[in-house]
């Protein structure tokens, strides 16, 4: 993936009229969506507690449309400002949606032993996105407003669940 991303970015930099968004760990308010980051980590047997930049689609997709209409160009780290750890996300899920939910942690070293490919953990620069849309919420506030509050109202829950051991 990162090799392809780099190649595409090298090609696109030659064009002046391109607007490219880099999403990271996309989250939407459909907690039963298998492509949703929350669904994924809630169904892992164990999670690594590391902070990352993330994209709350319900908030940011309208800004993508706005950016196109405003004819913005360039590459944007299309993530909510700040970073949040996996444990913080799961704690919000537990607090708002599933009080009996539990999870286990393991270390990066333990994770590396079971993964086919290494994972990257990043807090991406948010200066450019905050300049274009200063009203964008930080990641935690966005998760609460666009994902957890609506699911608290509707009773939304992740389907499935981790069954194994770390």
Say what each PLM segment does.
Residues 38, 57-65, 136, 140-147:
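Short, amphipathic alpha-helical "lid/cap" segments that border enzyme active or binding sites
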Residues 7:
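Active-site His/Glu-centered metal-binding helix of metallohydrolases
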Residues 4:
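Active-site helix of classical SDR
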Residues 13-18, 42-46, 69-73, 95-99, ...:
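Short glycine/proline-enriched coil/turn segments at helix->beta-strand junctions
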Residues 115-166:
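C-terminal amphipathic/interface module of NAD(P)-dependent oxidoreductases
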Residues 10-59:
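NAD(P)-dependent short-chain dehydrogenase/reductase
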Residues 63-121, 147, 158:
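Mid/C-terminal beta-alpha module of Rossmann-like enzyme folds, strongest
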